[in-house]
Amino acid sequence: MYASALASNKKYTFICLLPEHLEGEYWTAVETGIHEAIATYSDFNTSVKINYYDPYDYHSFENASEAILALQPDGVMVAPTAPQYTKGFTDQLQALDIPYIYIDSNIKDVPPLAFFGQNSRQSGYFAARMMMLLARDEKEIVIFRKIHEGIVGSNQQENREIGFRQYMKEHHPSCTILELDLHAERNDEDNENAG
């Protein structure tokens, strides 16, 4: 298989759509892994371009998606944002017969070719279990939720909360869950407002 791939003259172009991030944040490691894969598989006549969207601006995701569609790559790796914005993009990819995979967050209603990441619902369930090992007798707890344009920050965040609430309902039904919605701002704006 390796020899036939090397013998092929076809060039493949892949595009990754990731949220903009600061050096050292979670997405830095993801991007490093992408660059390592590019170097490792450079013999396969592939090129990979990374496009970014502003995670605090859903319209930025739409604009970045449109730019990718115009290039008509051979495949796309996308870190999904809110499902309603991701679905528009993936519907167009399907119409163009461009395969796509998700990284970090899975949207089951819009199934990809593959998904690489954790089960967000199980993660939330586990987080509640760990928290209640320390807060066992508490009568109230607070969930802090990132909200942007009236929408819970991400599909992943929403699924974590579902798992969290499921654990609490099953194991601590008398504990009241309070919500505090934090209206999302960029990290640099949060730092300016804190000072």
Please state what every model-predicted region is:
Residues 2-31, 113-114, 140-152:
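Short beta-strand segments enriched in small/hydrophobic residues
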Residues 17, 68-80, 99-103, 142-145, ...:
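Periplasmic-binding protein-like
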Residues 35-50, 169-175:
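Signal peptide-proximal N-terminal region
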Residues 47-72, 177-195:
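Structural motif
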Residues 68, 75-95, 164, 182-195:
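Hydrophobic alpha-helical
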Residues 84-122, 146:
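Flexible loop/hinge segments that line or gate small-molecule binding clefts
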Residues 115-141, 192-195:
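Hydrophobic alpha-helical segments within soluble ligand-binding/sensing domains
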Residues 127-172, 179:
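An alpha-beta-alpha
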